[in-house]
């Protein structure tokens, strides 16, 4: 989830610096990082340069990691995390290429695995703290497939058609699908310009309200199971949408619930900050530095500040989905 990833940053160089205060105490009792004839560089010197907000963010990330791991380690299966990482390695062409990509981002394989664990702990926290009823799940989700005919944003684009030709093609496909709804998947595989869904017979899986752009969502949620929409225009082109039969709803319910929780948190960050505050209180987290405490309360635990960060992130656009979650 992007919002939560924004708040819970990976342990970076500043975290290692904080760790130096304790882990290397036997090597340097006065916390000297570098010595020279011109003078020493101590942890305190660097921390002054870093600024309170950066120190607060990193300190909070470390303590939250410890607390979440203690509370939810028995609810997270590390084998599932290993399986996910194996899939990601395959997507990047193997373990060596995957680790090279991580290295370019300043992260080791072990750091990445820890971040994946933390993400799993976060999900457990929100499952505990954010209520989503079965009724909400039913009302706010729909299994969908689509066929997309892309419109070129500029004439030099390799993929897509002119607006006129794209619309004509979409209308022709829509009539064909309306006559033969059982062949939707076959037609999607052949005609759709959304390559990721085309190879799955056009399937988008379960779509959550608020997840897609407005015109797409409105058309989808008007459909009854098995129905096909008229041609729908979005900024990406022309779509033909189908409401699929929800034969796997029970097995997918937990995943749908997780998506709904993420959407709720995107819309109302206070749900997340309240969950953090309850957890910190439960674990008797005590801020020893008043400035650090204020920096954490004014940024990480302030839902309005999180909302601002969220809006800044969304300005870049995120494709067919609204939140990119």
From Swiss-Prot:
A lipid is attached at residue 21 (S-diacylglycerol cysteine). Gene3D superfamilies: 3.10.50.40. GO terms for cellular component: plasma membrane. It catalyses: [protein]-peptidylproline (omega=180) = [protein]-peptidylproline (omega=0). It holds the Pfam family Rotamase. Residues 159-202, 303-325 are annotated as: Disordered. It is an enzyme of class 5 (isomerase). Its EC number is 5.2.1.8. A lipid is attached at residue 21 (N-palmitoyl cysteine). Residues 139-245 form the PpiC domain. One of its GO terms (biological process) is protein folding. It is found in: Cell membrane. One of its GO terms (molecular function) is peptidyl-prolyl cis-trans isomerase activity. InterPro entries: Foldase_PrsA, PPIase_dom_sf, PPIase_PpiC, PrsA_foldase, Trigger_fact/SurA_dom_sf. The keyword Ribonucleoprotein does not apply. The keyword Metal-binding does not apply. Keywords: Cell membrane, Isomerase, Lipoprotein, Membrane, Palmitate, Rotamase, Signal. It is a lipid-anchor. Residues 1-20 form the signal peptide. Plays a major role in protein secretion by helping the post-translocational extracellular folding of several secreted proteins. Belongs to the PrsA family. This is Foldase protein PrsA. It comes from Staphylococcus epidermidis (strain ATCC 12228 / FDA PCI 1200).
């Amino acid at each position: 989830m992007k919002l939560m990833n924004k708040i819970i940053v990976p342990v970076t160089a500043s975290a290692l610096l904080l760790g130096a205060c304790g882990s290397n105490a036997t090597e340097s009792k006065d916390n000297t990082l570098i010595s020279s004839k011109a003078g020493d560089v101590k942890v305190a010197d660097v921390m002054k340069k870093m600024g309170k907000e950066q120190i607060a963010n990193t300190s909070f990330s470390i303590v939250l990691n410890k607390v979440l791991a203690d509370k939810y380690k028995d609810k997270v299966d590390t084998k599932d995390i290993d399986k996910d990482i194996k899939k990601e390695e395959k997507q990047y062409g193997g373990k060596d290429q995957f680790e090279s990509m991580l290295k370019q981002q300043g992260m080791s394989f072990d750091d990445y695995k820890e971040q994946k664990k933390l993400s799993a702990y976060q999900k457990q926290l929100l499952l505990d703290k954010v209520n989503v009823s079965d009724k909400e799940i039913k009302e706010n989700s729909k299994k969908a497939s689509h066929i997309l005919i892309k419109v070129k944003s500029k004439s030099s684009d390799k993929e897509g058609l002119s607006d006129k030709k794209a619309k004509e093609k979409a209308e022709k496909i829509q009539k064909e699908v309306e006559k033969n709804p059982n062949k939707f998947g076959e037609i999607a595989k052949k005609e759709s310009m959304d390559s990721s869904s085309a190879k799955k017979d056009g399937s988008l899986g379960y779509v959550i309200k608020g997840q897609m752009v407005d015109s797409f969502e409105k058309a989808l949620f008007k459909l009854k199971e098995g129905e096909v929409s008229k041609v729908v225009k979005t900024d990406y082109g022309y779509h033909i949408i189908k409401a699929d039969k929800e034969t796997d709803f029970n097995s997918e319910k937990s995943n749908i619930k997780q998506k709904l929780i993420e959407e709720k948190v995107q819309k109302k960050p206070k749900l997340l900050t309240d969950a953090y505050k309850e957890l910190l209180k439960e674990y008797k987290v005590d801020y020893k530095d008043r400035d650090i405490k204020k920096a954490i309360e004014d940024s990480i635990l302030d839902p309005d500040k999180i909302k601002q960060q969220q809006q800044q992130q969304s300005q870049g656009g995120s494709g067919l989905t609204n939140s990119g979650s």
